[in-house]
């Protein structure tokens, strides 16, 4: 009682018949003024504070009675007014090192090609750029380089756009195979290969970027997407070869083998592969890969056994694509070293979830998996694991005569330090406590319910949605197949997102994770008015 505070008014805690309560002493906002803490006065502005009026800076004097105009920020130079200061936002992005940045590298990753009419590798690859800035246009440039590795770079502009505030732009880009296939051909190369096939995406203001492979659901049977991470967010140790990534991957379930229990079709064998794809962003970048999967030889890379090492020097636009040649091959736990920023993707041309050791256990069907990996420095200790929207329920609501079943989600957690990690979840039984012994050690978790995961040491966390059969949707109905997501730790959640739901899909879902007290709005509507919110245990 007697304590003072500032809101839009000067308020004092007073004793009332109902107990202690805040009461208004003076309504500053009604006078067009603000409350000054400690002085408990209504003033025009907070003494010695700065703010923005559009792109003009305003400075409050020492008394709070007047404001003066400062400089006008030059948006043509990538400068915008933030907190009363003219700020070079791309330079600020280098300090903040988040997933919002000014330089990205995108790659048309290897996808499934299993015959006429089933060639996902040839379908529309796209990059989507969203502008999260509230007040400035983002000028975006996308480039490719048609020279070959080892030659001097000669970037070519392939697309430009001015993206309005809080908007996005879809860039439909041409195919650029990374598996050594000649232009116009798909899956005819050496699989493991060195190409100059990356796209560079730059902006004069920080943006968010995604890639879709392919984009639209038009005769699509194998697709996924990646959240791209900017160069500003990557691990950097110029001139010093340092561990940059511990790989989170997934077993490659479709491959021709000599084992009839795992060979999908002996008369017409289908070889699909897991991949680890490394993109150079700076000249003369040394890269070393300690692989946990056998690598098929191709280009400058010899056949490399599990536990072997691959080393190469990359330049801008160079793509070192490493691929497997075996059933259940899996790059998980591999370590990528680099002495300058490199972008790393992991995935599969197409694979199933759950994975299996015998075809009799398969839960159809497979799908393309891909994700740009997060660098080691972003590993965290506290995560929220969520379950995809129940597809059998949605298909039943759309009129199909099927029952609704509990839909599992598959998760993988991996240790990134030599000390390993001790994992605790809010699940019961054997999944409540997990022990990871050393760098690259991982554990798989299956769950039909949301849960919290905490670790005593930094880890990376991934989810893979279930194949259609595993989700209880019969083939022939629109049930969907696996997709992979790198789950960020709670400490890295953002306050706003601008995103795309691609066209021509039967169902679109958005999963929102937020603290219980958060106010969440989707396109102007409170989320609580659109969908039911579920509390996650823990």
Predicted features and spans:
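Cysteine-rich, disulfide-bonded extracellular modules and peptides in secreted proteins
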Residues: 1-95
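Conserved functional hotspot residues at active sites or interaction interfaces
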Residues: 4, 49-50, 87-137, 142-333, ...
